């Protein structure tokens, strides 16, 4: 007779609370830049992305037209292999920035910031 109560306890343990969901907000939503000029995109998280292991799980992706998203920056400021050094990431806690020192025509696309400290 104890099984139903134990099962209910397990189910309750796995119900996510909506108040704990992390919301990511990027600004600006659209940006027009002349080639050769710098560009900056901000990303704000509703909660700190600093993990107990000391790492901050914030990533930047670029999706070029007709292509899947490609990783640019991982853990706030580390450039992924092959990413040009004109791309840089910075920030901590809840506030992050992606900077492009000199925009090139090939940089056109949709930029996303993503967290992985909390997964669905």
UniProtKB/Swiss-Prot annotation:
Residues 75-81 are annotated as: Complementarity-determining-2. Residues 114-120 are annotated as: Complementarity-determining-3. Transmembrane segments: none annotated. InterPro entries: Ig-like_dom (IPR007110), Ig-like_dom_sf (IPR036179), Ig-like_fold (IPR013783), Ig_sub (IPR003599), Ig_V-set (IPR013106), IgV_Light_Chain (IPR050150). Residues 21-120 form the Ig-like domain. Keywords: Adaptive immunity, Cell membrane, Disulfide bond, Immunity, Immunoglobulin, Immunoglobulin domain, Membrane, Secreted, Signal. Disulfide bonds join 43-113. Residues 1-20 form the signal peptide. Residues 82-113 are annotated as: Framework-3. Residues 44-59 are annotated as: Complementarity-determining-1. Residues 21-43 are annotated as: Framework-1. V region of the variable domain of immunoglobulin light chains that participates in the antigen recognition. Immunoglobulins, also known as antibodies, are membrane-bound or secreted glycoproteins produced by B lymphocytes. In the recognition phase of humoral immunity, the membrane-bound immunoglobulins serve as receptors which, upon binding of a specific antigen, trigger the clonal expansion and differentiation of B lymphocytes into immunoglobulins-secreting plasma cells. Immunoglobulins are composed of two identical heavy chains and two identical light chains; disulfide-linked. This is Immunoglobulin kappa variable 2D-29. It comes from Homo sapiens (Human). The lineage of its organism: Eukaryota, Metazoa, Chordata, Craniata, Vertebrata.
